[in-house]
């Protein structure tokens, strides 16, 4: 894989998603009032999918004998093309080991509506798959959503939003295109030449395309995009459809797998490293993790009883908000099936606002974003208190997807995956030797080597790169600093059993774990050590009291300095966004660091960003976001 840094795409003004509305025409066909067209052929929707899109792309024959195959679709609709493709893949004993579908949809159905239309329109043989699709259907939030089926062997990456805005921001190596969507007369943007060219840049050398549409301007646009096109007999009442083949000599994407199947070495066994190792192991890669903490007989996050994962929102839906939203969804989908106590508890988060002015501004933000109310909604003080099960100081917003996570248990579970081995060692220096990167200890002895090395060692990453002569091209990374902080454990009985959900604002207070509620946290600049102590505990007690409106009477018996707690470091980069991706000046070296206070938000997402690029999969993030987090 070419370890390039993605250019930042120009940002378009935010436009909220407009969900699809279930409407049927007089013949009982699902109908789009927005575009004045039906969703499928009047004869047989699944038959159209098989005739036009599968046979039109030479499937299943073309995918046989391949390790992976990627399909790109415009217009997901109710998902019949995907379900038909899925069934064909299941039925073929010579299928590729991994099948990826990337599909764009400007007007997605809500989960309940999707299930209803599939119950009404999908054939009986696809109903079981339709149920699985609906069960994983994401909330109607703009951006990319990665779903996994068949134990991860089949992935569906949904792009919710305008196709002409999403298409230039996709990363993939596409083998077949399903060009669907409503007719050009009603939805010309779906067939815009610039949009088709943006999709065509993803085409593999032998890529094919198929579309039910045979309009002359569409065929001409596809020819200009680098395809040899022809008409073929259509399906049902249509005389013709369009087929295409990538022309030889046209530029192809450089997102081919990097050392496909080769072992990977991860430096760092904290949350970042564990998540990268887990993501790679799920894809069948052998991973070795270097754990410096084990040299001292320690475990990462030992004593860190619980932490919170809460998304953020912004009026302009800026990169931090988009990354946070994607990260929280990825964390839940990746970790929810882990064994207890590693699996997150999706208890929700009440995020309190400081004052009435900020609450009014937040209400305006939600009105602009128009996110689903079952994902985020305004709550007044009484509603917030009812959700928390305790009186709180103010109202704010409620994030239904807020989670409580036990970091130590999570890291242990991620590193226990099949294909992951751990070595107790400290990386002192990196050295290139042929096609391998060697990791040396302080005595210059080789600890491990691999063609691909991921540095996930937090604030030690700049030191390691500097000592290896590799830091100079990375000025942002060179400015990373370590910020100490501590959390305090409060007895749950002092809080009437503790809150039912995460309570956040100026600090945070978490639901009880093993009889203790975590209150946090402090920020200590310039500290020589990360320590718990009386001053930090006093700060955390005051923050907890501020969230509740007043200190509970039982707080009077809690003596700062005598309470249990945990202290650690945050690796902070300028802009407080993480750095994840390849190092352009050192092929084979990758970075996953700088997670600051949002390690839980970034870890699963950054792990999948790196693993997807290493394994030649469609990317789970848009290129403008990849540019924001690219190591530099």
From Swiss-Prot:
GO terms for biological process: methylation; tRNA wobble base modification. It catalyses: 5-aminomethyl-2-thiouridine(34) in tRNA + S-adenosyl-L-methionine = 5-methylaminomethyl-2-thiouridine(34) in tRNA + S-adenosyl-L-homocysteine + H(+). One of its GO terms (molecular function) is flavin adenine dinucleotide binding. The keyword Transferase applies. Coiled coil: none annotated. Its EC number is 2.1.1.61, 1.5.-.-. It holds the Pfam family DAO. Catalyzes the last two steps in the biosynthesis of 5-methylaminomethyl-2-thiouridine (mnm(5)s(2)U) at the wobble position (U34) in tRNA. Catalyzes the FAD-dependent demodification of cmnm(5)s(2)U34 to nm(5)s(2)U34, followed by the transfer of a methyl group from S-adenosyl-L-methionine to nm(5)s(2)U34, to form mnm(5)s(2)U34. This is tRNA 5-methylaminomethyl-2-thiouridine biosynthesis bifunctional protein MnmC. It comes from Bordetella parapertussis (strain 12822 / ATCC BAA-587 / NCTC 13253). The lineage of its organism: Bacteria, Pseudomonadati, Pseudomonadota, Betaproteobacteria, Burkholderiales.
